[in-house]
Amino acid sequence: MDIDFRVAIVLAPIAVAAGWAAFNIGAAAIRQVQNFLNREA
C-alpha cells in the first residue's frame, strides 16, 4: 500500500490548526471550569 504524500501535505496544516485550536479552547475551558468550581466553594 503506497501512501500519496500529497494528501498528507494537504491535511498536515489542517491537522496542526485543529490541534492548536483544540489546545487553546481546551485551556480556556479548563480555566473557566476551575473558576466556576472555586467560586462555588
Curated annotation (Swiss-Prot):
The subcellular location is: Cellular thylakoid membrane
Q: What does this protein do?
A: Loosely associated component of the core of photosystem II (PSII), it is not always seen in crystals. PSII is a light-driven water plastoquinone oxidoreductase, using light energy to abstract electrons from H(2)O, generating a proton gradient subsequently used for ATP formation.
GO annotation (BP), single: photosynthesis
Its protein name is: Photosystem II reaction center protein Y
Q: Give a GO cellular-component term.
A: photosystem II
Question: Key word Metal-binding present in the record?
Answer: no
Tell me what topology the record assigns in the membrane: Single-pass membrane protein
Q: Which UniProt keywords apply?
A: Membrane, Photosynthesis, Photosystem II, Thylakoid, Transmembrane, Transmembrane helix
List, alphabetically, the InterPro entries matched: PSII_PsbY
Q: Which HAMAP family match?
A: PSII_PsbY
Q: What sections of the protein cross the membrane?
A: 7-25
Question: Which organism is this entry from?
Answer: Nostoc sp. (strain PCC 7120 / SAG 25.82 / UTEX 2576)
